[in-house]
């Protein structure tokens, strides 16, 4: 905190620092000084801002630094030390999660669907402290088809009917009743049919106008693949205790579908599917998740990479307003230089296409100048000097 008489002095320092420091840092410093429990004097305000400016200035790159190459090296080199395995998730046998190098490759390749899509779903206050209520939400999320609750099926050729033997344990586990199964079948357009229920949860589905066994088998497959409840893409939903609350971990991801389920805290839903984040929340959120996912992958492997390198990778991937991969179909493939594109991948194709189009190489970048042995415009090469032999 500060004296009332020093408030105007703090505002003046904030105004001066705004010309040097980023706005976010200035605001954080102001809040820190204003909300500190002990009294902060004018001298201390000066020291805080001077130290912040000094640290910030030392953290800036030198003009002409090849930041792209440094970032590529700083993220890529630790990647060679990563493991190549898919791990079980936090002691849960049913869920696998891709970590290490395969996950890093997925992120920078901007894959539409990760190899192990998953979500971490937080619940609202009404649901997060009650396990039964959390299980209720999990059952709403888990995509359940009729085949998931059937122990066996058979076909009675004499009566042209399909017999489904329902599994009592699976019905209980999935939170599904026999009536739910009947309703799902009745929603199908199968022509004229009657469902008879017998003891032991056995359903006998008789058809009036079916005279072919092949047609009966097709109908059976259609019935087994019929949705009873849940959200498409969510194969499993498992309730886990985290601290003093229950959360739901899912095998599979469907962000837009999950947000519409009652009991889900929409402000805290997480998914490892970057494309879904982009579609639902936009490019800024996608950039944030790229940063978070790369940082998480590196941290899990015990690798320490400066955050600025990761930020640069995320910025390059999202700078056009859509998520692009770092590869020949994305960032690298869109370079203006013919030689730079050819140096990366499929060399002959790039050269032939460029020749057919009549492209001109302007030698403005780094790669193309190195290829032909020209000095590059980086570091001291950025400075152009003209010598005057006689100076009067």
From Swiss-Prot:
UniProt cross-references to Pfam families, sorted A to Z: RNA_pol_Rpb1_5
GO BP annotations listed: DNA-templated transcription
Catalytic activity annotation: RNA(n) + a ribonucleoside 5'-triphosphate = RNA(n+1) + diphosphate
Major place of residence: cytoplasm
UniProt xrefs under NCBIfam families: RNA_pol_rpoA2
Other information: Corresponds to about the last third of the bacterial beta' subunit.
Species whose genome carries this gene: Saccharolobus shibatae (strain ATCC 51178 / DSM 5389 / JCM 8931 / NBRC 15437 / B12)
Protein name (Swiss-Prot/TrEMBL): DNA-directed RNA polymerase subunit Rpo1C
The gene coding this protein: rpo1C
């Amino acid at each position: 905190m500060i004296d009332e008489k020093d408030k105007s002095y703090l505002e003046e320092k904030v105004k001066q620092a705004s010309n040097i420091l980023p706005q976010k840092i200035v605001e954080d410093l102001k809040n820190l000084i204003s909300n500190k429990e002990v009294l902060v004097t004018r001298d201390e305000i000066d020291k805080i801002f001077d130290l912040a400016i000094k640290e910030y200035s030392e953290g800036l790159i030198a003009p002409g630094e090849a930041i792209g190459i440094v970032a590529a090296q700083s993220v890529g080199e630790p990647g060679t030390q990563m493991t190549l395995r898919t791990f079980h998730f936090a002691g849960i046998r049913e869920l696998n999660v891709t970590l290490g190098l395969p996950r890093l490759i997925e992120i920078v390749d901007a894959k539409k669907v990760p190899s192990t899509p998953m979500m971490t779903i937080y619940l609202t206050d009404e649901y997060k402290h009650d396990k039964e209520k959390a299980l209720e939400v999990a059952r709403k999320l888990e995509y359940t088809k009729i085949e998931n609750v059937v122990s066996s099926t058979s076909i009675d050729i004499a009566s042209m009917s399909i017999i489904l033997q329902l599994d009592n344990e699976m019905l209980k586990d999935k939170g599904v009743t026999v009536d739910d199964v009947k309703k799902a079948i009745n929603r199908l357009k199968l022509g004229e049919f009657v469902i008879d229920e017998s003891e032991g949860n056995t359903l006998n589905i008789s058809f009036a106008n079916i005279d072919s066994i092949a047609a009966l088998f097709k109908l059976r497959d259609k019935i087994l693949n019929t949705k009873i409840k849940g959200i498409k893409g969510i194969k499993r939903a498992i309730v886990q205790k985290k601290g003093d609350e229950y959360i739901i971990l899912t095998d599979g991801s469907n962000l837009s579908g999950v947000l519409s389920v009652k009991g889900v805290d929409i402000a805290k839903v997480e998914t490892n599917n970057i494309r879904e984040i982009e579609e639902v929340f936009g490019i800024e959120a996608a950039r944030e998740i790229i940063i978070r996912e790369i940082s998480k992958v590196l941290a899990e492997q015990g690798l320490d990479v400066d955050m600025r390198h990761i930020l640069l990778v995320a910025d390059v991937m999202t700078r056009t307003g859509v998520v692009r991969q770092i590869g020949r179909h994305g960032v690298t493939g869109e370079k203006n230089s013919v030689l730079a594109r050819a140096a990366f991948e499929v060399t002959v194709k790039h050269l032939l296409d460029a020749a057919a189009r009549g492209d001109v190489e302007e030698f403005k970048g780094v790669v193309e100048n190195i290829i032909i042995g020209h000095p590059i415009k980086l570091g001291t090469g950025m400075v152009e000097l003209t010598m005057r032999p006689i100076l009067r």
